[in-house]
Amino acid sequence: MTSIPIFESVSRFLPPANEDVQFWWKVTGRHMACMMHEAGYPEYRQVECLLFHRFKVIPCLGPRPHSDTPWYKSRVGGGAADGCPINYSWRFGTIERKPHIRNFIEPLGALTKTPADPLNEVATKALLQDYSMTLPNVDLEAFWTFAPHYRPRIIEKEDMEKLAGASLLVGAEMSPDSRTIDIKAYMYPRVPSQTSQLLTTILPQAMRDTYGEDVCLDSLNFVHDFMTNDPQGSQLALTGTTGIDCCKLQETRVKIYVITRNTSFDHIAAIMTLGGRRSISGELLGQLKALWYELKGAPAELPSSEQLPVQTKPDGSRNPIVVPFYFDIQPRLALPDVKAYIDVSTSPVSDLAAAKAVVRHLEQHGSGQNPKAYLNVLKDITPVEELETQKGALAFYSVAVKKNELDITSYFNPQVYKRYFAHEVQLNGQRRSVFE
């Protein structure tokens, strides 16, 4: 592991803590320090963000692992994750912008996984309220207005037990040249009927309650029409997941997440361009196609109208491929922005090969500042041999079009549970974790 002087200096002067906090600091605190160091954050910003992580994130991560099985399986990180309540993202920089670091957590508290909090929302709401009192840029007006619309109206005990699970996540973005921490909240409807009503009932009413009865719903209505009437858009399905910025109301964005099972690149391009309504140059679509094929392990000669080859699991069963997107809704804009997610956790391409493909793309097209710093981060968090032979470190790459270039973000996992025994050493006849 690379020595990170700022992490070591901050650690030296932290107050005593219990074993849970010590564990999460040693693991995730060091991960955050490594990311900011490699991304070239100013030293004052590294210290500021590390202190935020130690005192405002780590206390919400719950008990330290005591085996390779999580006591509560968080949905952070999606299908690639191992149940750990935190993961990270690295938004690659541009020529003019350094990389941006984020983490995503599902706060865990005393009531998590108990009948008192079946949706695990108590700790999250308490954390958001704390952020609103300590971070001057955080405004929860939109979140508090949206949240009741997403809460299930469940009366029957059997239904509540069946639908229990995560309903809220929190994201924290730590930009290198800012003095603030930007907070996002993610809501998950637990009842299937809520998801089907999202575009027609829940979101329109939530937006009117938030922004006022005269709010412009053109962007939201476009998404509904696109998913209803467009030949390509009608193949999309709502997941129910909705993200919202916790900032001043006039700056708040609402993100609606969808998936498709059509893996042809022509379909991907049609969604990114909203059926031709958003202009994306042929050059950028060509870059996206090349990246899509490489990350998915598809042959370069595969026609863009064809589906990706079927993938199989080790047991011989099919590994279904879904492609997530989100629509970025802003009342002041007539059309939403679109972002695609490329799931590499189910790809035949190794995590290391996928990471190198993205870095190679950035270098070839003159994007990003020192993109190989990202490889240094991955190799510091996960040994190279595991990146070459195992899956799970990488979850997704997201791709949007910003200022006539591809804006790429990597989402990856600390694998705290999966790797619990990976680096054990034999000591006095006892198996001990490297984290102990």
UniProtKB/Swiss-Prot annotation:
Matches recorded under CDD domains: PT-DMATS_CymD
Keywords in alphabetical order: Transferase
One Pfam family in the UniProt entry: Trp_DMAT
One BP annotation, GO: alkaloid metabolic process
Gene name for this UniProt entry: nscD
Keyword Nucleotide-binding: no
Protein task: Prenyltransferase; part of the gene cluster that mediates the biosynthesis of neosartoricin B, a prenylated anthracenone that probably exhibits T-cell antiproliferative activity, suggestive of a physiological role as an immunosuppressive agent. The non-reducing polyketide synthase nscA probably synthesizes and cyclizes the decaketide backbone. The hydrolase nscB then mediates the product release through hydrolysis followed by spontaneous decarboxylation. The prenyltransferase nscD catalyzes the addition of the dimethylallyl group to the aromatic C5.
UniProt keyword annotation of Nucleotide-binding present: no
EC number from the UniProt entry: 2.5.1.-
Family: Belongs to the tryptophan dimethylallyltransferase family.
InterPro entries (UniProt xref): Aro_prenylTrfase, Aro_prenylTrfase_DMATS
A molecular-function term among this protein's GO annotations: prenyltransferase activity
Source organism, top-level taxon: Eukaryota
Protein name: Prenyltransferase nscD
Pathway(s) served: Secondary metabolite biosynthesis
Species name: Trichophyton rubrum (strain ATCC MYA-4607 / CBS 118892) (Athlete's foot fungus)
